[in-house]
């Protein structure tokens, strides 16, 4: 399905307006097709350009759809990615306004912080996994959607910045030496009750697989990852709905604990 530039710009503006007003809108796939990744990424790029023109600062990327069960649910066989901006970041144990993200859910992930630029050519696993290029830290990602009741398909989440809302970053980053990112167990509680668990193996088999996929994808687009970029590699367990006033704490073996509280309104 070929989508006109005028339609892409209108849909991008619809997304921005929905996010600003905190109101759900009909799924974008109704206009572009459920699996039209090309149009969906074009809409995402339009809104990223709008954000940069407004003075927002790009600090990294997120990888989504890294769990095979989620891929099967949405009928896709690949991850997607979105952009992280500085004004989306919160620190460990900070309070997040509940209304900052529409229909919020939360995921526990592994974040990688680049200490050196990645090659502009197609990066390899050794390029990405080089211990001198990476540090690892503990994030929570708060995702959301403008589609009613999380009724989304591939095109909907891609266009909507891969459903990215906010992220909480616990630090400082630590070297990869001695870390078993694949086998690391994750546990997340909501108000002291266990609500999500998993391991690094649930993120494309290994969190570094997600990072390599992202690095190669961005290199092909002529926008390689740079020193200082943050990469959220994908959920290690099921995402969990957030209610006003909730407190979440999550721990990953070897990386430690990170927490966040949501305001009452």
Curated annotation (Swiss-Prot):
Origin: domain of life: Bacteria
This protein's UniProt keywords: Aromatic hydrocarbons catabolism, Lyase
Give any GO molecular function from the UniProt entry: manganese ion binding
According to its record, what are the GO cellular component terms?
cytoplasm
Question: InterPro entries from the entry?
Answer: Fumarylacetoacetase-like_C, Fumarylacetoacetase_C_sf, Hydratase-Decarb/MhpD_sf, Keto_pentenoate-hydratase
Q: Which residues form a coiled coil?
A: none
Q: What is its EC number?
A: 4.2.1.80
Pfam short name (any one): FAA_hydrolase
Q: Tell me its cofactors.
A: a divalent metal cation
Keyword Calcium included in the entry's annotation: no
Q: What is this enzyme's catalytic activity, as reactions?
A: (S)-4-hydroxy-2-oxopentanoate = (2Z)-2-hydroxypenta-2,4-dienoate + H2O
Q: List the disulfide bonds.
A: none
Q: Which SUPFAM superfamilies match?
A: FAH
Q: Which Gene Ontology BP terms does the record give?
A: 3-phenylpropionate catabolic process
Identify the metabolic or biological route this protein is part of. Answer: Aromatic compound metabolism; 3-phenylpropanoate degradation
Q: Which family does it belong to?
A: Belongs to the hydratase/decarboxylase family. MhpD subfamily.
- Role according to the record: Catalyzes the conversion of 2-hydroxypentadienoic acid (enolic form of 2-oxopent-4-enoate) to 4-hydroxy-2-ketopentanoic acid.
Q: What is this protein called?
A: 2-keto-4-pentenoate hydratase 1
- Organism, by scientific name, is Pseudomonas putida
């Amino acid at each position: 399905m070929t989508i006109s530039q005028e339609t892409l710009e209108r849909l991008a503006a619809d997304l921005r307006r929905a996010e600003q007003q905190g109101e759900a809108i009909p799924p974008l796939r109704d206009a572009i097709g459920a699996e039209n990744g090309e149009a969906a990424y074009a809409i995402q790029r339009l809104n990223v350009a709008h954000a940069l023109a407004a003075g927002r600062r790009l600090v990294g990327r997120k990888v989504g759809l890294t769990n095979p069960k989620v891929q099967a649910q949405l009928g896709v066989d690949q991850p997607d990615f979105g952009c992280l901006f500085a004004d989306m970041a919160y620190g460990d144990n900070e309070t997040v306004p509940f209304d900052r993200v529409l229909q919020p859910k939360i995921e526990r992930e592994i974040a990688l912080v680049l200490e050196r630029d990645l090659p502009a050519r197609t990066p390899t696993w050794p390029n990405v996994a080089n211990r001198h290029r990476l540090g690892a830290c503990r994030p929570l990602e708060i995702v959301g959607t403008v589609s009613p009741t999380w009724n989304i398909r591939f095109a909907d989440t891609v266009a909507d910045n891969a459903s990215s809302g906010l992220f909480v970053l616990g630090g400082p980053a630590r070297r990869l030496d001695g870390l078993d990112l694949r086998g690391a167990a994750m546990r997340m509680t909501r108000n002291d009750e266990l609500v999500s668990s998993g391991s690094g193996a649930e993120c494309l088999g290994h969190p570094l697989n997600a990072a390599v996929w992202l690095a190669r994808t961005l290199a092909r687009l002529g926008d390689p990852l740079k020193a200082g970029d943050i990469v959220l590699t994908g959920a290690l367990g099921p995402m969990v709905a957030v209610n006003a006033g909730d407190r979440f704490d999550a721990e990953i073996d070897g990386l430690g604990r990170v927490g966040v509280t949501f305001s009452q309104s």
